Amino acid sequence: MKYIKRLFVLSGLIILSSCTNLDETIYDQVSTENYYNTKMDVTRAVFRPFEHAYWSVCSRQVLQELSSDIVATWKKDDWWEDGGRWSRLHYHTWTIEDGEPKTEWDGCFVGVMQCNYVIDDLNTLNPSDYGFTTAEFENLKAQCRTLRAWFYLRLLDSFRNVPLAVSRDASKNSEGQVTPKVLFDFIETELKDCLDLLQTKAGAAGNGTSQGQWNKAGAAALLVRLYLNAETYIGEERYDECAKYAQAIIDGDYGTY
């Protein structure tokens, strides 16, 4: 009996003196805290939303082209009927059950949030810790902001009043839809800011290792598109600004084309 009592006492002492630090070293997950270790890690994160942007263009092409007088996909015997989805786009008789508008909405907002996550992360990093100059680092951040503006310009064009999300922190985002004017002003401000931070295209041929990346001319071209359609979007004529940025591109202010 004494042996059993001693065993219980000993067990209790072992339990009470057990380790209380339950922090884990996780090897099967990558978080913000342990992802950014090298310059290449930062670069990879920045360009992840670009891959999504490339994919998301598919829905945009369908909505823009098949609903216009440029492209029509006609039924050929029993081919390309697909429940009449292509004909409905051509005749502007689509319904809430058609998937193309939802695909465009989802594609754009997934892209927006991918950009937001990267921008939030970049705001916590010190460029010199990863071998970046300040100009290089700000260029990468500006590319994400420009890409986000491109997604929002598509949303403005297709849906007008949409939610405005600028961070993974929900408190910084709109609680619901914003007006087209608010969205227009956000896009305009972002693109103008990024014009000073993005690189200028070098040379008359391709853009070397920066081919396919956002640069000053790309941001200016988005401003041209924004101002060209301002009367439709927000009821304001902005043709003078449209002409200004278009002429600057033609004059080579943002690189040779």
Segments (PLM) and residue ranges:
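Short, well-structured active-site flanking segments
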Residues: T25, L156-S167, Y239-D240
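Extended, well-ordered alpha-helical segments in internal regulatory regions
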Residues: F151-P163, L223-I234
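Tetratricopeptide repeat
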Residues: I187-C194, C242, I249
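TPR/Sel1-like alpha-solenoid repeat signature
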Residues: R145, A220-L223
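Short, surface-exposed recognition loops and adjoining beta-strand edges that mediate ligand/DNA contacts
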Residues: E33, R60-W79, R168, Q199-G218, ...
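Bacterial Sec-dependent N-terminal signal peptides
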Residues: M1-D28
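Membrane-proximal, proline-rich intrinsically disordered regions
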Residues: C19-S68, A246
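Conserved, well-structured interaction surfaces
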Residues: T43-F47, E51-S56, W79-F159, S174-V182, ...
